[in-house]
């Protein structure tokens, strides 16, 4: 078995796929033989993908606008012809504050992007998917252990896991595997903003907050985008052909809420 080319002749849709985790996954899939369609809210990132990749097509799409999703899925099938893999990667960090300082608007925005966009993408695309495919929804370890001051975010990630487990049962007869990927403390600009916001709430320094957050993981280090792309490849290829309905953490073993 050629472990580096297991997605040859496969097609994939990756939402929020022009930067960060989604882009790392899209690149890994392309390197492994897949033809990939991505959407993203960052037009500069979309332009970069289209300039630098032969087998990844990117378009602008604001997944907080539900009415744009049907059009995005139609564009996916126009480009790919058929669809084997869906990666629901869209997500925002949401507000970082105590429950009394959270806003209803912030809650609703987090729900829309992190949960409703996943549902709507699958509602429209899954009936047209090829049997024997795979769906991977990016959740978070916050959907397993809970994160203080991140109530909307954590709630949506629990929801993503619940959707994946339920859909795995429903789509089993079609041999479509459905799993959730749970990143831990992911290195990057978004994580830095979260650490900064939590440090402000706690009244401590950025470095103190970062050290405290990393101490929650047994391995004591950040997760990289590439770590997550490798796991996504495993779960969406034949390497994970008997794995479905699972919530797979890539977090360095976060043992406690933080």
Feature names for model-found ranges:
Residues 172, 177, 243-245:
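Short, small/polar-rich loop/turn modules that mediate ligand/substrate recognition or access, typified
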Residues 122, 156, 164:
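Active-site helix of classical SDR
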Residues 102, 146-154, 166, 194:
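Active-site loop-to-helix junction immediately N-terminal to the catalytic Tyr of the SDR YXXXK motif
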Residues 180, 204-243, 250-252:
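C-terminal helical subdomain
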Residues 2-4, 93-96, 145, 221, ...:
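Short C-terminal tail/terminal secondary-structure segment
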Residues 140:
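Residue(s) in the substrate-gating loop at a strand-loop-helix junction
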Residues 97-99, 103-111, 213:
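Substrate-binding pocket helix/loop in short-chain dehydrogenase/reductase
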């Amino acid at each position: 078995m050629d472990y580096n080319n297991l997605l040859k002749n496969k097609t994939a849709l990756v939402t929020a796929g022009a930067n960060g985790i989604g882009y790392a996954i899209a690149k890994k899939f392309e390197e492994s033989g897949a033809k990939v369609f991505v959407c993203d809210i960052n037009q500069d990132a979309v332009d970069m993908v289209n300039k630098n990749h032969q087998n990844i097509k990117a378009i602008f799409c604001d997944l907080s606008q539900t009415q744009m999703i049907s059009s995005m899925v139609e564009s996916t099938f126009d480009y790919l012809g058929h669809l084997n893999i869906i990666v629901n990667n869209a997500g925002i960090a949401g507000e970082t504050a105590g429950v009394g300082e959270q806003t209803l608007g912030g809650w609703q925005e987090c729900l829309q992007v992190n949960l409703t966009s996943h549902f709507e993408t699958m509602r429209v695309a899954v009936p047209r998917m090829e049997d024997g495919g795979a769906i991977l929804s990016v959740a978070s370890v916050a959907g397993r252990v809970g994160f203080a001051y991140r109530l909307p975010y954590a709630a949506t990630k629990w929801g993503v896991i619940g959707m994946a487990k339920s859909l795995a049962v429903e789509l089993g007869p079609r041999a479509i595997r459905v799993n959730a990927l749970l990143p831990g403390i992911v290195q990057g600009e978004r994580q830095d903003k979260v650490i900064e916001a939590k440090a402000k709430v706690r009244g401590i320094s950025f470095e103190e907050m970062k050290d405290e957050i990393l101490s929650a993981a047994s391995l004591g280090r950040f997760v990289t985008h590439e770590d997550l792309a490798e796991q996504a490849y495993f779960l969406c290829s034949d390497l994970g052909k008997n794995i479905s309905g699972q919530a797979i953490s890539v977090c360095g073993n976060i043992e406690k809420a933080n």
